[in-house]
Amino acid sequence: MKQHLRPIMFVGTCSDAGKSVINAAFCRIFKQDGYQPAPFKAQNMSLNSYSTPEGGEMGRAQVVQAEACGISPHTDMNPILLKPTNDKSSQVVLNGKPVGNMSAKDYFGIQNQKEELFKEAIEAFKRLEARYNPIVLEGAGSISELNLRDRDITNMRMAIAAGASTYLVADIDRGGVFGSVYGTIALLRPEERVLMKGVIINKFRGDASLFEEGRSLLKELTGIPVVGVIPWFRDIKIEEEDSVALDMKNNTYKDGKINVAIILLKRMSNFTDFDVLEMDPRFNPYYTNNIDEIEKADIILLPGSKNTLSDLQSLRANGIAMAIIRAHKAGKKVIGICGGYQMMGVRLEDPESIEGNIPAIPGLGLLPQCTVIEQEKITRQSDFAFLPSSENKDCKGYEIHMGRTTLLGDAPEQPVARLEDGRTDGYYLNNRCWGSYMHGILDNPAVLDNLAEGFDTETTTGPFDYAAFKEEQYDKLAALVREHVDMEYIYNSIKN
């Protein structure tokens, strides 16, 4: 039996410092070394979410980390999820289930409520700790937001409760790494500082030996050692949850590929649905709201949305809706997932004002259906057959939506998928026009091959195995971090 290890936690000097990816790396390292690790983040804010086997909803960053651990995702790994519905409020998901919408002012301002949520987070952590060893915790944003510190339940307060050996991750690519590391550590309270075991410099470009003096200077300034300098990399593909990652993605057409325009929505959710297209050499996916780039594409994908009616209203106002309709008439493929699927119908209705103040709006009119937004939230995983009449019976996906879609008039039932329990999903008008509620549907080789039908590319390839590809990436990430981090020091800091 492996020695019990203390929890380890990675916190940041800023958002997008690379905490989630480093957390995933250590999840895989501990798994490789014979431990049974599990990830944990007390509170996450994201529109990229996932439905667990039990039907609970959680952030996708912890799903990626669970995959790196080789275990099934569970809502205990992310007990509190905030899903922004507009610029000022979010849906609160507690232990996998929605408990209502709250403004940021109310969420951070009601102290009793924050205490109750923190208790829920602690209980989830304890349940995980009873089953796994070690727990690999992740903080959120910067740990030095003094105006939020007394109400922060994700960072150093969680580190103290867990008794976690804590490491500060700093993004050197942004510049100002000395000030950010020194300032962050200087602002720690004594009970927080005692947990801080080391600093990891992330996203270093060039020869890391040139930072040796920097290591010494930071140790001298803070009293805390730099235990790793991780290089900037682009050749290891790990799913990223933060919307800031979209800024780094491709946004233009390329010759010789199947060009896929993914429509940028203000409240876009689950853009991770399209990560597989970046890995399959047949496709060139790009995120855009530029009409010229949309009309040049071979395939147009409408993603999910946390505020479908509002996003559709914007598409109508800025001319993108008409561009999609013109592209469809010109023979381009148009495919929608979840909210994008709802947009493809004749009409969307929100009679109870669940999403906002738009009671109804015409859809794109590409599919013979109407959607009514409802209070009940569907969250479930599904095994299904893609195009029920075909042999593609071993597909997997998951649903997260608040809406019921029904066919209009005498439209024939032409589902995209038939689920194991006999239910059907989506509408398949033809190879050029279909939609589905199923997140992760493109991760299935049969669906990718259907997407590629009818196109000639310079790339010839067999079926793309995304699951195997991801496993390779986790191993490559672990190898990179092992090479550039003092693992002996790390292990010594978490051995009881």
Swiss-Prot record:
Catalytic residue list: 338, 439
Pathway membership: Cofactor biosynthesis; adenosylcobalamin biosynthesis
Listed GO MF terms: ABC-type vitamin B12 transporter activity; catalytic activity
Top-level taxonomic group: Bacteria
Keywords: Cobalamin biosynthesis, Glutamine amidotransferase
Pfam short name (any one): CbiA
Keyword GTP-binding among UniProt keywords: no
GO biological process, alphabetically ordered: cobalamin biosynthetic process
Domain GATase cobBQ-type: start-end pairs: 257-447
InterPro entries recorded: Class_I_gatase-like, CobQ/CobB/MinD/ParA_Nub-bd_dom, CobQ_GATase1, CobQ_N, CobQ_synth, GATase_3, P-loop_NTPase
Family (UniProt): Belongs to the CobB/CobQ family. CobQ subfamily.
Function: Catalyzes amidations at positions B, D, E, and G on adenosylcobyrinic A,C-diamide. NH(2) groups are provided by glutamine, and one molecule of ATP is hydrogenolyzed for each amidation.
Protein's UniProt name: Cobyric acid synthase
Record organism: Parabacteroides distasonis (strain ATCC 8503 / DSM 20701 / CIP 104284 / JCM 5825 / NCTC 11152)
